[in-house]
């Protein structure tokens, strides 16, 4: 009995590794969701503000803030590092981490990463409100130093770097390789949006409503097209993805201070926009995504040869090519 026990543990571990190697994307998303939701679900199910009240207790708000700060990086970062280590070893982890400091890209891409996700919704709000919000921002340029910059730095330190290590660092190259840039982007945006779901049952992103969450999810998908476009033009730089992510969060906080709390517009957009700033985001980022698809002919800057280099570890010259063969058990 003891012999079977000691043998079965390594066998189970080996079987799990083979499963992860065979399905790295599925493994990544399962671990990413589990690593984050394990922190957030107790709050979402509790009697806290916006919680579902299924659990018969409430948890101090400070605990939620700490859990949120820990949960945001825990899932995607640990998932990307764990799956990469299993599928590609130390060399693969090293390749992934080197892309986190890939800074040699054109200055224009830095400007797009920093200001792009601020200008797109600003232009959208300008159209719907009939106000030149870019000029309004210039008139209140101090917001860039007092809100935009501090928020961006805070998000980099607490969330965006760890998140992007997983979403763009690990998942996006593999999704593009398997499904192409458009479908791969839609899948990533959808799963990224769903990953946030428990936070909508807390005071951080709640209260939950189907229209509000649907707007968030559609915006997340549309926004992911801009991320993919930047990613593909910056040699898969996780650093630029991190910067884009952080500045998008900072941009939303600036917009809150520049636009009315309740939006009222007329015309075709009224059912989407009225009473919800999220509706403007849906339209603004949706139009941006469609334009990117149109002008890049659906490629979003995707280059298969370069994308492969983001996934496969270079083989040393003269090293034998090893291929793992899956045996069916038939002789």
Region locations from a protein language model:
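Membrane-helix interface linkers and caps
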Residues: 8-21, 43-112, 126-141, 230-236, ...
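N-terminal membrane topogenic signal
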Residues: 16-29, 277-280
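Alpha-helical transmembrane segments
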Residues: 25-36, 73, 111-121, 189, ...
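Aromatic-anchored segments of alpha-helical transmembrane domains
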Residues: 33-41, 118-126, 189-199, 246-255
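C-terminal membrane module of polytopic membrane proteins
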Residues: 48, 236-239, 243-331
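Juxtamembrane helix-entry segments on the extracytoplasmic side of multipass membrane proteins
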Residues: 136-153, 204-218
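Membrane-interface helix/loop boundary segments of multi-pass membrane proteins
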Residues: 162-189, 203, 232-237
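Interfacial helix-loop-helix junctions of multi-pass membrane proteins
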Residues: 199-210, 258-265
């Amino acid at each position: 009995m003891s012999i079977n026990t000691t043998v079965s543990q390594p066998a189970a571990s080996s079987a799990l590794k083979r499963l992860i190697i065979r399905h790295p994307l599925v493994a990544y998303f399962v671990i990413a969701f589990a690593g984050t939701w394990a922190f957030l679900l107790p709050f979402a199910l509790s009697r806290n503000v916006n919680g579902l009240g299924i659990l018969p207790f409430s948890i101090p708000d400070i605990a939620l803030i700490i859990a949120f700060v820990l949960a945001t990086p825990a899932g995607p970062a640990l998932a990307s590092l764990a799956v990469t280590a299993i599928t590609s070893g130390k060399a693969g982890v090293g390749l992934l981490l080197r892309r986190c400091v890939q800074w040699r890209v054109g200055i224009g891409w830095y400007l797009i990463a920093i200001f792009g996700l601020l200008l797109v919704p600003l232009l959208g709000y300008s159209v719907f409100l009939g106000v030149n919000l870019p000029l309004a921002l210039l008139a209140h340029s101090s917001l860039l130093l007092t809100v935009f910059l501090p928020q961006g730095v805070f998000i980099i330190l607490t969330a965006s770097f760890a998140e992007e290590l997983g979403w763009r660092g690990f998942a996006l190259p593999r999704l593009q390789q398997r499904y192409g840039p458009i479908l791969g982007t839609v899948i990533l945006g959808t799963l990224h949006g769903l990953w946030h779901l428990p936070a909508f049952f807390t005071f951080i992103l709640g209260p939950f409503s189907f229209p509000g969450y649907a707007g968030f999810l559609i915006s997340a998908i549309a926004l992911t097209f801009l991320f993919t476009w930047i990613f593909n033009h910056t040699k898969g730089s996780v650093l630029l993805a991190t910067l884009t992510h952080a500045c998008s969060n900072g941009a939303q906080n600036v917009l809150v201070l520049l636009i009315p709390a309740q939006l009222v517009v007329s015309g075709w957009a009224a059912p989407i926009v009225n009473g919800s700033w999220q509706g403007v985001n849906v339209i603004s980022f949706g139009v941006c995504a469609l334009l990117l698809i149109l002008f890049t002919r659906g490629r979003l800057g995707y280059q298969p040869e370069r994308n492969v280099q983001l996934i496969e570890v270079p083989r040393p010259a003269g090293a034998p090519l090893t291929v793992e063969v899956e045996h069916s058990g038939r002789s």
